[in-house]
Amino acid sequence: WHINPLLISIVDIEINSDFQNQIESYNDQYILSSFQDHVVAGGVFSFEYNGQNLSYNSNSLYFKTTFESAGGTLFNFHELISKPKNPNTNSYDFLGIRYAHFQKATIDLRYYQGLSDRSKIIYRIYSGIGIPKKNLSNALPFEKSFFAGGSNSLRAWRARSLGPGSYYDSANRYDKIGDIKFEGNLETRFPI
């Protein structure tokens, strides 16, 4: 069990207009989102079971589920005291910065099947959903969004390069992120 009742992440960047124009010219949502001010204040609860055995010739199970909630306490407090919303963003601020408001849950299930004393097959299913709430109701914060590809996902693809369909826009960098993820893969591990 892992319980972290309070996690606070504050991003407050002072950007001069030349730099702002430069990052906007890239037309890259990943870069633009990396330089937006925001606060994530919430907690995380997770349960992890690891029955892995170092022996290659054995079968084992790994399971982890995580639940994360952010912004709910702040939002309810601001509603209770009738704090006025920021007219530019139509949202509440914390320390003058807009804060995220969401709930997110994930499940990671892996089964390790021993084939011999030097090889295994790993079956993996990963699923998650994030639900944006009232203060930022259109999407999860960029760093909390789901994506496929990369070292902790489907390793043969770059991070954020897999997504709906096979759309590729050569004029823009199209990062494929979302609020829902369902991923399954099969991997064979053996010495080279």
Predicted regions and their residues:
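C-terminal outer-membrane beta-barrel translocator/porin domains of Gram-negative envelope proteins
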Residues: 2-192
